[in-house]
Amino acid sequence: MDVRSFHWWRTVFFLIPVIGVYTMVLGTLSIASSLIDRSGHFAHRCARAWSWLILATTGVRVDVRGLERLERGRTYIFVANHQSIYDIPVIFASLPYQLRIIAKESLGRFPFLGWHLRRTGHLLVDRRNPDRAGILRRWRALVGEGLSLIIFPEGTRSPDGRVGAFKAGSFLLAIEAGLPVVPISVDGTRFVMRKGHLTTRPGDARLLVHEPIETSGLAPGDARALAERVRAIVAGAVTHDEAGAEDARGSATAPPQRNPGAAARHVDA
């Protein structure tokens, strides 16, 4: 049996059934907890446990760097590139923060999933008809509860790992809410599971946390420039993204903004 066939059989007859069990058990606990815990904190812990189990079972080792750049107790908007479905467990397992995802409204059509996501604080956005005022109001409510947000501004997974253009809408909301933006570079997950492919392989992934970018003092008209700056930073740390690396070198003139707080690995998530 060749290597490709082995990984296909391993995916279909081992990983999918085992991960299915993890999802049913932890998903049931998460849904049950949301009936009494509207904060979603316990549901988030279930999501982190689910992420750790998936990565361990698949054989994905994650090298996490840059957590010391984050300030303990602060709320952030984490902005990441999107290579693979595995980006989500990598991020949830690596960032010791209470995270909520900004996702497509279409997820809300799945039985139980949409109801559960909304109930535990995740934001589902209709990109065709976004209610900016409503989204901003919900963002501020989450910030008031000490929650951080994770967004994938490319809007879809990259088929080849290259970082696509970042949509400016989320950055406009970040500016209006006055929230710091943290660029996150995720690399290697495309070799674990590529877009449009079922086969999953063990491998190494890397998550790099860049310096937070303060949005105080920025105007709504700066959203596009902020999106391009963050995209350049993220792409510059992704392997083989030469265009992104050139953009990142061009953005190096922007002064770094460091938060001198305690390392985020000590944050209670």
What feature does the model see in each segment?
Residues 83-138:
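Membrane-embedded segments
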Residues 74-80, 99, 147-151:
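Generic beta-sheet signal
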Residues 54-57, 78-79, 100, 125-130, ...:
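Short, flexible loop segments at the rims of nucleotide/cofactor-binding pockets, characterized by
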Residues 64, 78, 101, 122, ...:
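Generic preference for hydrophobic
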Residues 61, 68-72, 83-90:
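Soluble extramembrane domains of integral membrane proteins
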Residues 2-63, 115-119:
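A transmembrane-helix-recognition feature enriched in membrane-embedded lipid enzymes
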Residues 2, 133-269:
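Non-catalytic C-terminal accessory region of glycerolipid acyltransferases
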